[in-house]
């Protein structure tokens, strides 16, 4: 399904509202991170929101940036505004293979895919950020890159791994109960 920006805003606000309800009801008091929501929760929130959006048919990328000693993470919708990175492969060096084998891995004798997203691939994408209020910004931001997100030096972006197990599943289920 293809969503317009207003529908994405609606989904993002609904999900943030569910997080806020769970937080205010004390459902996160036992969680090492979410008991301080939104402070320090941007990465985990990205995984939770990406899972919710994926269930609605919306794919996203996880983006991380740094500003001084601070880091921040947000999603970029994976749609026609985002360009796919050019495929890159390389053969690990003998030293890398030695280290891999030393830690119980198997030596690579074929090229390894090292394709990754660069800032230029995502610069025209739509950002979805539910935790910028930890920096005094709006609690739900959906839009093109703004002054706040430009402050963060691009570190990396990758395809989302969706919540499948562990602590994040528990958090997702808590939030989902408030949707």
Predicted regions and their residues:
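A structural boundary/capping signal
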Residues: 1-179
């Amino acid at each position: 399904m293809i969503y317009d920006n207003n529908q994405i805003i609606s989904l993002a606000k609904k999900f943030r509202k569910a997080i806020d309800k769970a937080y205010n009801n004390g459902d996160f008091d036992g969680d090492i991170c979410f008991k301080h929501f939104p402070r320090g929760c941007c990465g985990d929130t990205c995984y939770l929101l990406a899972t919710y959006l994926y269930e609605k048919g919306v794919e996203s990328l996880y983006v991380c940036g740094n500003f001084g000693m601070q880091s921040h993470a947000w999603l970029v919708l994976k749609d026609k505004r985002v360009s796919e990175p050019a495929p890159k492969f390389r053969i690990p060096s003998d030293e890398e293979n030695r280290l891999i084998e030393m830690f119980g891995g198997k030596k690579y004798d074929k090229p390894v895919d090292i394709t990754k997203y660069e800032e230029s691939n995502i610069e025209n994408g739509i950002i979805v950020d539910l935790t910028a209020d930890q920096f005094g910004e709006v609690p739900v931001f959906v839009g093109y890159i703004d002054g706040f997100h430009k402050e963060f030096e691009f570190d990396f972006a990758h395809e989302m791994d969706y919540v499948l197990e562990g602590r994040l599943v528990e958090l997702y289920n808590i939030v989902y109960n408030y949707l």
